[in-house]
């Protein structure tokens, strides 16, 4: 008997091209997220309290990048869901699908309104400056970045490469380093020595875990954006 050679299936350039494009988008998305968080924090350390209180343009520049990033990411995800071939069949999946899209619309709308409303409202205290230049940019960018990345992973358009995951961990560590460096140099040395690959090795990106992370993050993001919307409504009511 003669052995018959059966050619193994392989990916064509056309099949690999969309995946490479998706990986590039996630890489650029990660860089944009780091810049969107780092710039407001840098402005917090560069300018003093009185400058923030007196200059509305400075307040506008502080929140423009993170909230623009947030609105762009949620609108992009909404557009991707609308263009996808996924059509929920049963009632439960339809409810989850349309609820997710409704959250994306709400988050994008609140982000756009915040760019207009939050800078006009004077940041009178140091706590207000910290909230608007450190806390809100971090959580706004973090939630949008995680939603984008995990959604791509669940849809299997990319793989969780070392670059993408280390960028995600670096984003979280960078915020803690910058915020705590001002008060304790010992904390900075500790975080600097934390091995990022350790997180990668212990984190298993299963679909079930990613869905649970996405669900938890969306719940936290809902409360956060509700707080932002409440601040915007109070300001608009007092105008």
UniProtKB/Swiss-Prot annotation:
InterPro entries: UPF0328. It comes from the Eukaryota. Residues 7-17 have a biased composition (Basic and acidic residues). Residues 1-23 are annotated as: Disordered. Disulfide bonds: none annotated. Pfam families: DUF2463 (PF09591). Belongs to the UPF0328 family. This is UPF0328 protein ECU05_1660/ECU11_0070. It comes from Encephalitozoon cuniculi (strain GB-M1). The lineage of its organism: Eukaryota, Fungi, Fungi incertae sedis, Microsporidia, Unikaryonidae.
């Amino acid at each position: 008997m003669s052995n018959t050679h059966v050619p193994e299936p392989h990916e064509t350039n056309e099949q690999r091209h969309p995946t490479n494009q998706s990986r590039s988008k996630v890489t650029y998305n990660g860089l944009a997220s780091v810049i969107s968080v780092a710039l407001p924090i840098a402005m917090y350390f560069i300018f003093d309290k009185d400058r923030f209180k007196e200059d509305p343009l400075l307040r506008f520049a502080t929140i423009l990048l993170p909230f623009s990033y947030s609105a762009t990411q949620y609108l992009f995800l909404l557009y991707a869901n609308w263009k996808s071939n996924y059509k929920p069949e049963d009632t439960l999946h339809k409810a989850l699908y349309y609820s997710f899209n409704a959250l994306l619309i709400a988050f994008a709308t609140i982000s756009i309104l915040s760019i207009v409303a939050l800078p006009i409202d004077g940041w009178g205290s140091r706590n207000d400056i910290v909230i608007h230049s450190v806390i809100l940019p971090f959580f706004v960018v973090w939630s949008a970045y995680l939603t984008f990345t995990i959604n791509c992973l669940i849809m299997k358009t990319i793989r969780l490469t070392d670059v993408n995951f280390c960028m995600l961990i670096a984003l979280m560590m960078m915020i803690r380093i910058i915020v705590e460096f001002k008060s304790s140099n010992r904390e900075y040395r500790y975080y600097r020595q934390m091995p990022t690959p350790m997180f990668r090795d212990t984190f298993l990106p299963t679909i079930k875990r990613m869905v649970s992370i996405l669900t938890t993050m969306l719940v936290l993001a809902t409360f956060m954006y509700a707080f932002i919307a409440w601040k915007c409504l109070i300001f608009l009511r007092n105008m």
